[in-house]
Amino acid sequence: MAKGKRKNPTNRNQDHSPSSERSTPTPPSPGHPNTTENLDPDLKTFLMMMIEDIKKDFHKSLKDLQESTAKELQALKEKQENTAKQVMEMNKTILELKGEVDTIKKTQSEATLEIETLGKRSGTIDASISNRIQEMEERISGAEDSIENIDTTVKENTKCKRILTQNIQVIQDTMRRPNLRIIGIDENEDFQLKGPANIFNKIIEENFPNIKKEMPMIIQEAYRTPNRLDQKRNSSRHIIIRTTNALNKDRILKAVREKGQVTYKGRPIRITPDFSPETMKARRAWTDVIQTLREHKCQPRLLYPAKLSITIDGETKVFHDKTKFTQYLSTNPALQRIITEKKQYKDGNHALEQPRK
């Protein structure tokens, strides 16, 4: 067919199929199988163009979502910085007011002493001195009220800062939800395999060949973090793999837990979820406790963002922080003894290592 004279696929269907408005396909006859090879070339081209347009729209929507989320995160960070500056300025004002109050009190004390001296000498109190004392007392009262108001404002700003920090943490964790963090891969492997993406594919082939057969390993982004290589850093930088969705990431993490030990070229490595720095710090605080509980078959699990879940005597308990966990230990002497002995053993080894430094 000549270029520019392509028939409309819709008109073609109207010419050759009276019931084209129905969506039910005609069952293929034995002699003419209904395959994509027998479709009209123009219809195939039209369908492929539609698929490409859908892909482009999807990627554009995803990019727009990431850009809007990044802008929102930047705005929250700027608001947090402004709040921190206000808190610092108010703290400075409080210090200045407190210094002024101390000066006034000192002046008042000196004036009182002067009045007492004059009273002893003359037996009378000068009216101007009484007015001065009254003025000082009023200034002190006003300064104390100002300090109280500023203290209230500082507390409110501190609370607002904490809420903003938590919101930023949630946004960062949401953006990182499809991510995987790979720990223990030497930097030189990037040059040998031409990038972290190929390293990840190599890990999947080596440890989880069935997963690669069952689902496509589509990687949106792969990079080392932090971006700049620090020559003084002893360990290699972590690799971040951004998958197409969180379901693929969760399936890989489940396979990692079931396998127990993941390797790369025979060497052990670690694959973990990717969280914000604040969330990672909170989760690391449970490391020693989880290791001890796992050794005593207490089935510990770390829930998002940093909650400890344990199963004892068939009952599952969840602790949001170490304070709650410590309170529970006071009601469970056996578990408290296990945790205490482990801590004492670790502290003893640390004390033995001190003279070697």
UniProtKB/Swiss-Prot annotation:
Q: Which UniProt keywords apply?
A: Coiled coil, Cytoplasm, Nucleotide-binding, Nucleus, Ubl conjugation
Signal peptide limits: none
Task: Quote the protein name from its UniProt record.
Answer: LINE-1 retrotransposable element ORF1 protein
**Cellular-component GO terms for this entry:** cytoplasm; cytoplasmic ribonucleoprotein granule; cytoplasmic stress granule; nucleolus; ribonucleoprotein complex
Residues annotated as coiled-coil are: 59-156
Outline the subunit composition.
Homotrimer (via coiled coil domain). May also form larger homooligomers. Interacts with Tex19.1 and UBR2. Interacts with MOV10.
Alphabetical list of Pfam families matching this protein: Tnp_22_dsRBD (PF17490), Transposase_22 (PF02994)
Compartments, record wording: Nucleus, Nucleolus; Cytoplasm; Cytoplasm, Cytoplasmic ribonucleoprotein granule; Cytoplasm, Stress granule
Q: How is it modified after translation?
A: Polyubiquitinated, probably by UBR2, which induces its degradation.
Region of interest (Disordered), ranges = 1-40
The tissues where this chain's protein is expressed are given as: Expressed in meiotic spermatocytes and in the cerebellum (at protein level).
For the region C-terminal domain (CTD), give the residue spans.
Answer: 278-339
Per its UniProt record, what Gene3D superfamilies does this chain match?
L1 transposable element, C-terminal domain (3.30.250.20), L1 transposable element, RRM domain (3.30.70.1820), L1 transposable element, trimerization domain (1.20.5.390)
